[in-house]
């Protein structure tokens, strides 16, 4: 599985290159036509924002192997029981909302094997809308730990974020804290945990991908 360690996520390079090219062209034109200079400044600022958005910082993952860590930076907007249709079980669901200002690289929540993946083509409702769980475009991983515990992590597309990137595939061995994908321009990650998991976060808590402990498996 691909796992980029570069300071900027590889998916951001085309956007950065495009913005820089436009800024340079406008700067050259701006030497003769002042109006183009101001446009060059705008695209220069846009380049900095894109670099900020696609930043890919290192994270220190907790040592406890039973700890399920946050797959995304953001805020917990849902915490409670939920029946997960792919496993057909009552599980504990934790939803993390990512704004455009959060790091958007997603990380593996627990070490294990990808039993299966799924992709659902759907709408692009605001991810804070309850309907987004069932109607929005989404991609998920069903992961099984060495102890046989199963959990699911789902990338949910949103109103602005319409591009889900997932590097993991069925059969992959995932390592907790490693990068496995991203969602462009803000969205949501849903984590479905075994119901007996000891949850360690609350509604409204801020999470840091790869570091914040969501819960402890039995």
From Swiss-Prot:
Major localization class: membrane
Q: Which family does it belong to?
A: Belongs to the phosphatidylserine decarboxylase family. PSD-A subfamily.
Q: Where in the cell is it found?
A: Cell membrane
User: Could you tell me what this protein is called?
Assistant: Phosphatidylserine decarboxylase proenzyme
Q: How is the cofactor bound?
A: Binds 1 pyruvoyl group covalently per subunit.
Q: What kind of membrane protein is this, topologically?
A: Peripheral membrane protein
Q: Which InterPro entries match?
A: PS_Dcarbxylase, PSD-A
Offer a single GO CC term for the protein.
plasma membrane
GO MF terms, alphabetically ordered: phosphatidylserine decarboxylase activity
Keyword list, A-Z: Cell membrane, Decarboxylase, Lipid biosynthesis, Lipid metabolism, Lyase, Membrane, Phospholipid biosynthesis, Phospholipid metabolism, Pyruvate, Zymogen
UniProt PTM: Is synthesized initially as an inactive proenzyme. Formation of the active enzyme involves a self-maturation process in which the active site pyruvoyl group is generated from an internal serine residue via an autocatalytic post-translational modification. Two non-identical subunits are generated from the proenzyme in this reaction, and the pyruvate is formed at the N-terminus of the alpha chain, which is derived from the carboxyl end of the proenzyme.
The protein's matches in NCBIfam families, at most eight in alphabetical order, are given as: PRK05305.1-2 (NF003678), PRK05305.2-5 (NF003685)
What is this enzyme's catalytic activity, as reactions? Answer: a 1,2-diacyl-sn-glycero-3-phospho-L-serine + H(+) = a 1,2-diacyl-sn-glycero-3-phosphoethanolamine + CO2
- Per its Swiss-Prot or TrEMBL entry, what cofactor is needed? pyruvate
Its quaternary structure?
A: Heterodimer of a large membrane-associated beta subunit and a small pyruvoyl-containing alpha subunit.
- The protein's Enzyme Commission number: 4.1.1.65
């Amino acid at each position: 599985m691909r796992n980029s360690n570069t300071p900027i996520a590889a998916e951001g390079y085309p956007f950065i290159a495009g913005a820089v090219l436009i800024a340079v062209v406008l700067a050259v034109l701006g030497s003769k036509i002042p109006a183009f200079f101001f446009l060059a400044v705008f695209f220069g600022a846009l380049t900095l924002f894109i670099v900020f958005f696609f930043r890919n910082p290192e994270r220190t993952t907790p040592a406890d192997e039973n700890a399920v860590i946050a797959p995304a930076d953001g805020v917990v907007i849902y915490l409670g029981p939920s029946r997960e249709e792919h496993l057909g079980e009552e599980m504990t669901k934790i939803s993390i909302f990512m704004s455009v200002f959060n790091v958007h690289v997603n990380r593996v929540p627990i070490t294990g094997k990808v039993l299966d993946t799924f992709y659902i083509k759907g709408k692009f409702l605001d991810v804070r809308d309850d309907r987004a769980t069932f109607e929005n475009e989404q991609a998920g991983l069903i992961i099984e730990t060495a102890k046989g515990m199963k959990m699911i992590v789902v990338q949910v597309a949103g109103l602005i974020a319409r591009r889900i990137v997932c590097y993991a595939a069925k059969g992959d061995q995932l390592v907790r804290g490693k990068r496995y994908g991203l969602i462009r321009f803000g969205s949501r990650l849903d984590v479905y945990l075994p119901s007996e998991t000891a949850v360690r976060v609350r509604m409204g808590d801020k999470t840091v991908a790869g570091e914040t402990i969501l819960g402890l498996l039995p």
